[in-house]
């Protein structure tokens, strides 16, 4: 399948649908962890309950700050509007907590059919969330597409048997080889779906 032919579109949230201006280096600094530490994976190894709660509180505050600062990525709102017009199902799969996710979605008016956070499905790169969405839509994973900006997103798609699309930014071009598709701007994908509509019509 080519871009514009997939029967459902699933998005990562931060760095994909929205720019939350998240600085994970700063988060690691706040936590006192080495730069580049995988946040949720390292948190799961913390055995001391007091330290776990301290770290979790810092992470949750960080996510809420991101939700309050988030803005639509260029072209994302127009793409979602077109997909809804064409009755193509849409979803969000994010590693964020539920309260921060919904604060962001409600503040920006982002509407999709399914939203799964790390409290609703195992966190990426576990493919369970993508498979849950595919099952809810009763569509084969191979006929859907997952769009994200990080290697976790691409690994999650691959594990689910779903095409993975890298949403490019200034720092993630080295993930190109892990992606089935690469997208520089949401207007490009919107055009693909517009052309599909004309062909079908």
Model-identified regions with their sequence ranges:
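Asp-based, Mg2+/Mn2+-dependent phosphohydrolase catalytic module
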Residues: 1-7, 81-85, 98-201
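Hydrophobic alpha-helical core bundles mediating ligand binding, dimerization, or RNAP-core interactions
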Residues: 24-28, 60-63, 101
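Conserved phosphate-coupling serine/threonine residues in phosphotransfer and NTP-handling enzymes
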Residues: 16, 94-96
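Metal-dependent phosphoesterase signature
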Residues: 45-81, 86-88
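A short acidic, glycine-rich active-site loop
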Residues: 41, 66, 119
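A general structural signal for well-ordered alpha-helical segments in protein cores
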Residues: 24, 39-40, 52, 56, ...
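Compact structured core domains
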Residues: 88-89, 95
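Active-site neighborhood of HAD-like aspartate-dependent phosphohydrolases
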Residues: 1-43, 48-51
């Amino acid at each position: 399948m080519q871009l514009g032919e997939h029967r459902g579109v699933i998005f990562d949230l931060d760095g994909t649908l929205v720019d939350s201006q998240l600085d994970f280096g700063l988060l690691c600094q706040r936590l006192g962890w080495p730069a580049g530490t995988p946040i949720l994976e390292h948190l799961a190894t913390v055995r001391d309950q007091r330290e776990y709660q301290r770290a979790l509180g810092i992470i949750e505050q960080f996510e809420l700050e991101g939700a309050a600062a988030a803005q639509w990525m260029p072209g994302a709102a127009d793409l979602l509007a077109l997909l809804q017009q064409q009755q193509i199902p849409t979803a969000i799969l994010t590693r964020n907590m539920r309260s921060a996710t919904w604060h962001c979605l409600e503040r920006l008016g982002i509407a999709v059919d399914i939203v799964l956070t790390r409290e609703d499905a195992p966190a990426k790169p576990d493919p369970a969330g993508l498979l849950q969405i595919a099952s809810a839509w009763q569509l084969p994973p191979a006929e859907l597409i997952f769009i994200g900006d990080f290697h976790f997103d691409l690994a999650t798609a691959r594990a689910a048997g779903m095409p993975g699309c890298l949403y490019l930014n200034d720092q993630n071009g080295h993930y190109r080889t892990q992606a089935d598709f690469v997208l520089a701007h949401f207007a490009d994908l919107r055009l693909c779906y517009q052309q599909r509509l004309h062909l079908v019509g």
